[in-house]
């Protein structure tokens, strides 16, 4: 398999913090993986993906994307990453269509291909009939779906999703997960997915890494982790390895 993301002994320590937010974390994400980074709230998931996106530097360790170091990887490598943040990054007084067209132009996209891309994703995610309504009128689940489309506009090689199904209704959650599975299967899109919902991630992810208090607990292919630990679920794997019930801090 071809390596897309190579994380080597990465740590992040904030000033005044009693412990490192991320401590000596190493993992590999191959092209085509649906990789779940799982852990309770406060485990270090958001800090990790913020470093991966280049929002701030590591305290120590190296991040490689397509073989380029985090410090020197090219503009093209940076553009290969799409991010869907946990916060809704949309303008409430613009329509879904206006939001997505504006964001597309910020990426340097234009023309009929941009319009077709937006229409396709809105249709697949069940939002075509509402695309000319202002975001302020959307439900939380609808906003999450538009947020996802924003991260897909430039057809990224790696799509990073930070808790994409938090606080959404069942219909929106199912629509998001099914669309992501389709993108992975048909386009080979690599997905990095953070969550503290182990059951959901077990069904969705091909590979899983569990972190807690900034440290790696275990990682591997989802089915192999369950089988090799003689467990029936990732929840049981976590309990067996740590001795603790998975908790939402």
Regions found by a protein language model. Give the residues of each.
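Conserved ABC ATPase "signature" region
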Residues: 101, 105, 112-130
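Conserved catalytic motifs of ABC-family nucleotide-binding domains
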Residues: 155
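Catalytic Walker B motif of ABC-type/P-loop ATPase nucleotide-binding domains
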Residues: 159-163
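Helical segment within the ABC ATPase nucleotide-binding domain
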Residues: 174-186
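ABC ATPase "signature
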Residues: 219-220
């Amino acid at each position: 398999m071809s390596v897309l993301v190579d994380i080597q002994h990465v740590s992040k320590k904030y000033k005044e913090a009693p412990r490192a937010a991320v401590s000596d974390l190493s993992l590999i994400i191959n092209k085509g993986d649906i990789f779940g980074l799982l852990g309770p709230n406060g485990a270090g998931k958001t800090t990790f993906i913020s470093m991966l996106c280049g929002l701030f530097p590591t305290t120590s360790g190296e991040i490689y994307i397509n073989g380029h170091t985090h410090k020197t990887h090219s503009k093209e490598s940076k553009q290969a990453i799409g991010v869907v943040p946990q916060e809704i990054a949309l303008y409430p007084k613009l329509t879904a269509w206006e939001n997505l067209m504006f964001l597309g132009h910020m990426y340097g996209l234009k023309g009929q291909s941009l319009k077709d891309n937006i229409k396709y994703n809105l249709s697949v995610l069940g939002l075509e009939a509402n695309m000319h309504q202002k975001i302020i009128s959307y439900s939380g689940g609808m906003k999450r779906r538009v947020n996802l489309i924003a991260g897909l506009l430039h057809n990224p090689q790696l799509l990073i999703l930070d808790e994409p199904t938090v606080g959404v209704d069942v219909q929106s959650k199912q629509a998001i997960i099914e669309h992501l599975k389709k993108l992975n299967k048909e386009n080979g899109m690599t997905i990095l997915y953070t969550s503290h919902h182990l059951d959901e991630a077990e069904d969705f992810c091909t590979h899983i890494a569990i972190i807690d208090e900034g440290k790696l607990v275990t990682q591997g292919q989802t089915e192999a982790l369950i089988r090799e630990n003689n467990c029936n679920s990732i929840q049981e794997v976590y309990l067996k390895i740590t001795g603790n019930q998975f908790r939402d801090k």
